[in-house]
A protein has these predicted regions:
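Gly/Pro- and small hydrophobic-enriched strand-loop and loop-to-helix capping segments
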Residues: 127-136
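Catalytic cores of alpha/beta
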Residues: 111-123
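Conserved N-terminal beta1-alpha1 strand-loop-helix module at the mouth
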Residues: 1-104, 111-114, 136, 145-155
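Short, conserved, surface-exposed binding loops centered on an aromatic residue
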Residues: 120-121, 144-145, 157
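Bateman (tandem CBS) regulatory domains
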Residues: 98, 125-126
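Short, conserved beta-strand edge motifs with alternating hydrophobic and charged residues
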Residues: 129-130, 154-157
Length: 157
């Protein structure tokens, strides 16, 4: 794994450890993964480590997501990683509230099942996993989390 991915995995694990959500504390409904078709997944991304700021601080993520849907996006991806990409879990909830029932996914460097629970609590329909960041044990734990929601995960390397 690259040094960048190692750093991102460590920071993500630290955020997961700080999370207070637990499955027994939340009664989450089953969310659809798609609306029956798939064309484009549009992305809300504030910053890039290589490009710097991609959006102004004044960006209204809800309005941007609604414009993506009006333009034909079948789903919206929201980058929630805070240190390198300027994202927050709250951004995910904003977008979900703006475009429901359009599927919205959390894009982050996820390493712990609690982070999937956070995504579900924010209303996400799915998450992106980076398989090369996860040990076999972590991948099994995360995939078991999906199955616990009655979902069949799709994974590719």
């Amino acid at each position: 794994m690259s040094d960048f991915l190692k750093t991102m995995a460590k920071q993500s694990a630290d955020r997961a450890a700080a999370a207070q959500l637990r499955p027994a504390e939340l009664d989450l409904p089953v969310m659809p993964l798609s609306l029956g078709s798939f064309d484009v997944i549009a992305e809300i991304k504030n910053r890039s480590p290589s490009e710097g700021a991609l959006a102004s601080e004044a960006l209204n993520r809800a309005e941007q997501a609604a414009r993506y849907v009006e333009g034909g996006a079948a789903a919206i991806s929201v980058l929630t990683e805070p240190t390198q990409f300027g994202g927050e879990i709250e951004h995910l909830a904003e977008v979900v509230n703006a475009v429901s029932p359009i599927p919205v996914m959390r894009k982050d460097f996820l390493v712990d099942p609690v982070q999937i629970l956070q995504a579900r609590a924010a209303g996400a329909s799915g998450v992106l996993l980076i398989a090369t960041m996860l040990s076999d044990a972590q991948m099994d734990e995360v995939l078991d989390q999906f199955k616990g929601y009655g979902k069949q995960p799709t994974a590719a390397q």
